C-alpha cells in the first residue's frame, strides 16, 4: 500500500490492522471516484481564489484531474489496493505528476468532507434515475390504462374473488403509485442537494474557503452551512435516499407478486414474453417467471441496506469510522434496486392479457356488491340491502355482464371514471 496520508514519522503501520481498517474501501470508492475528482477540481479552484494556489498550479491540477478522470474511465488508471482509498489515490497521482501543487490540494479539506461531497453527488445522480424510471413505469401504465380501460378482470381482496374490476383500474393504480414514487425521489433529491465540501473534519478550518464557488461549480442548490450538521447528515441522507428508492421497489414487489399469481397455471390471466422466463435444469416442461421473482426479491436488498445504515447511526455527533460501512449498503441497495426498475417498463409494455381466462374467473357472486348498492339507492337501508345480497350472492350475476358492472362504477377513480387525464397531467408535471 502506498504511503498513508495520516502516517506519523517513526510509527510503524501494522499490515493486518491496516487491511482491516481499509476493508473494501478502495474497491467501493470506484463508484465515487469520478465525483471525487470533480469535487477536487472545484476545491482547487476555491483554493486559488483565496491565494493558496497560483494560477499556474491550478491550471496544472485541473489538467491532471481531467487526465486522471479519462484514464480511469478508459481503464488506464486502476483504483486498487495499493491505495488506502480513492482520496489517497487522487492526491498520490497529483503529487507524482505535479509535486508540491499536488501536496497542496488537501489544504482546508478533510477526507470527511471529501467523502461527504462525493457521496452527495452520487446520491443526486441515483435519485434522478429513480425518478426517471418511476416516470417511465407510470407512462407505460397510463398508456395501457387508456387502451385497456374496458377490459374486465377479476378484482381480489384477501386473494379471493371480490368484485368485477378492469385492466384500466389495475393499470391506473400502478400509474399513480409510480407518479408518487417519482415525486418522492425528486423531493429527496432536493433534500440531499446541499454542498458539504468545505466543512473539513466537521468543525471548519481557519481559512476563508470559497464555499459559494464550490456549491455553484458542483451544481448544488445550496450550501450545507453547519460543519456539525454536515457530519450528522452522513447516513441520514443516505437513509432518506434508500427510503425513496424503497418506495419504488416496494411497489415493484407488489406488482411482481400480482404477475407471479396472474402468470401461474392456476390463474392464467397473463402471458409473459419468453425472454422474461427461464427453464428448469431437470423438468423440461417448466417455464419459470424468474425475472419477476427476482424483481419481487429486490426490495429485500433495499430494506437490508436501510436497516444497516439505521443501525450504523447509533452514534454521537462528529465523524466516526463506523460510517465507512454505509458505502457498501447504498451501493448494494441502489445497484439491485435500479437494475430491477430498469427492466420494469419494457416488461409491463409487453405482457399480454388472456381475455378468456379473465372472463372465466368472473363469477356470479362478484356482482353482489352491485346488487346491494343498487338496493340502497332505491331506498333500502344499506345494512338490510347487504344482508339480502349476501343471501342471494350465488345468483347475483343473473342478467348482468362485466361491462355493465364496470359502466355503473362511476365513483371518481373507478372503472367508469378513471380520471386518466388528471393522472396524465400529474405525470407531465414531472418533466
Curated annotation (Swiss-Prot):
Give the catalytic activity.
2-(N(omega)-L-arginino)succinate = fumarate + L-arginine
Which SUPFAM superfamilies does the UniProt record give? L-aspartase-like (SSF48557)
What are its E.C. numbers? 4.3.2.1
Question: Cellular component terms, GO, for this chain's entry?
Answer: cytosol
Q: Name one GO biological process term.
A: arginine biosynthetic process via ornithine
Tell where it localizes: Cytoplasm
Gene3D superfamilies tied to this protein:
Fumarase/aspartase (C-terminal domain), Fumarase/aspartase (Central domain), Fumarase/aspartase (N-terminal domain)
Q: In which pathway does it act?
A: Amino-acid biosynthesis; L-arginine biosynthesis; L-arginine from L-ornithine and carbamoyl phosphate: step 3/3
Q: Does the keyword Lyase apply?
A: yes
Tell me, what is one Gene Ontology molecular-function annotation carried by this entry?
A: argininosuccinate lyase activity
Q: Which UniProt keywords apply?
A: Amino-acid biosynthesis, Arginine biosynthesis, Cytoplasm, Lyase
Family listed? Belongs to the lyase 1 family. Argininosuccinate lyase subfamily.
Q: What is the designated name of this protein?
A: Argininosuccinate lyase
Organism, as annotated: Stenotrophomonas maltophilia (strain K279a)
Amino acid at each position: 500500500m502506498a504511503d498513508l496520508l495520516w502516517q506519523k514519522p517513526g510509527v510503524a503501520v501494522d499490515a493486518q490492522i491496516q487491511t482491516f481498517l481499509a476493508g473494501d474501501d478502495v474497491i467501493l470508492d470506484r463508484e465515487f471516484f469520478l465525483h471525487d475528482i470533480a469535487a477536487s477540481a472545484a476545491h482547487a479552484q476555491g483554493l486559488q481564489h483565496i491565494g493558496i494556489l497560483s494560477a499556474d498550479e491550478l491550471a496544472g491540477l485541473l489538467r491532471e484531474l481531467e487526465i486522471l478522470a479519462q484514464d480511469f474511465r478508459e481503464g488506464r488508471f486502476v483504483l486498487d489496493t495499493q491505495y488506502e482509498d480513492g482520496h489517497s489515490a487522487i492526491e498520490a497521482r497529483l503529487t507524482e505528476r505535479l509535486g508540491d501543487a499536488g501536496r497542496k490540494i488537501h489544504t482546508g479539506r478533510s477526507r470527511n468532507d471529501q467523502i461527504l461531497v462525493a457521496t452527495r453527488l452520487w446520491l443526486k445522480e441515483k435519485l434522478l434515475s429513480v425518478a426517471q424510471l418511476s416516470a417511465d413505469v407510470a407512462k407505460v401504465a397510463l398508456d395501457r390504462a387508456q387502451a385497456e380501460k374496458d377490459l374486465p378482470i377479476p378484482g381480489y381482496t384477501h386473494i379471493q374473488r371480490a368484485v368485477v374490476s378492469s385492466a384500466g383500474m389495475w393499470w391506473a393504480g400502478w400509474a399513480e403509485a409510480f407518479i408518487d414514487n417519482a415525486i418522492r425521489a425528486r423531493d429527496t433529491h432536493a433534500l440531499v442537494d446541499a454542498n458539504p465540501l468545505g466543512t473539513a473534519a466537521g468543525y471548519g478550518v481557519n481559512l476563508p474557503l470559497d464555499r459559494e464557488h464550490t456549491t455553484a461549480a458542483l451544481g448544488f442548490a445550496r450550501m450545507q452551512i453547519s460543519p456539525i450538521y454536515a457530519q450528522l447528515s452522513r447516513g441520514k441522507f443516505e437513509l432518506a435516499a434508500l427510503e425513496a428508492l424503497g418506495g419504488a421497489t416496494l411497489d415493484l414487489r407488489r406488482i411482481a407478486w400480482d404477475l407471479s399469481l396472474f402468470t401461474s397455471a392456476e390463474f392464467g390471466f397473463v402471458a409473459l414474453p419468453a425472454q422474461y422466463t427461464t427453464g428448469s435444469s431437470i423438468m423440461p416442461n417448466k417455464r419459470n417467471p424468474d425475472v419477476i421473482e427476482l424483481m419481487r426479491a429486490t426490495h429485500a436488498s433495499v430494506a437490508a441496506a436501510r436497516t444497516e445504515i439505521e443501525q450504523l447511526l447509533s452514534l454521537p455527533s462528529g465523524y466516526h469510522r463506523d460510517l465507512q460501512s454505509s458505502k457498501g449498503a447504498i451501493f448494494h441497495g441502489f445497484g439491485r434496486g435500479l437494475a430491477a426498475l430498469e427492466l420494469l417498463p419494457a416488461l409491463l409494455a409487453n405482457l399480454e392479457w388472456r381475455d378468456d381466462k379473465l372472463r372465466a374467473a368472473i363469477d356470479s357472486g362478484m356482482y353482489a356488491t352491485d346488487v346491494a348498492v343498487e338496493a340502497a339507492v332505491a331506498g333500502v337501508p344499506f345494512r338490510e340491502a347487504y344482508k339480502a345480497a349476501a343471501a342471494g350472492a350465488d345468483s347475483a350475476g343473473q342478467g348482468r355482464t362485466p361491462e355493465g358492472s364496470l359502466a355503473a362504477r362511476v365513483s371518481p377513480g373507478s372503472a367508469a371514471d378513471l380520471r386518466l387525464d388528471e393522472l396524465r397531467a400529474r405525470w407531465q408535471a414531472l418533466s
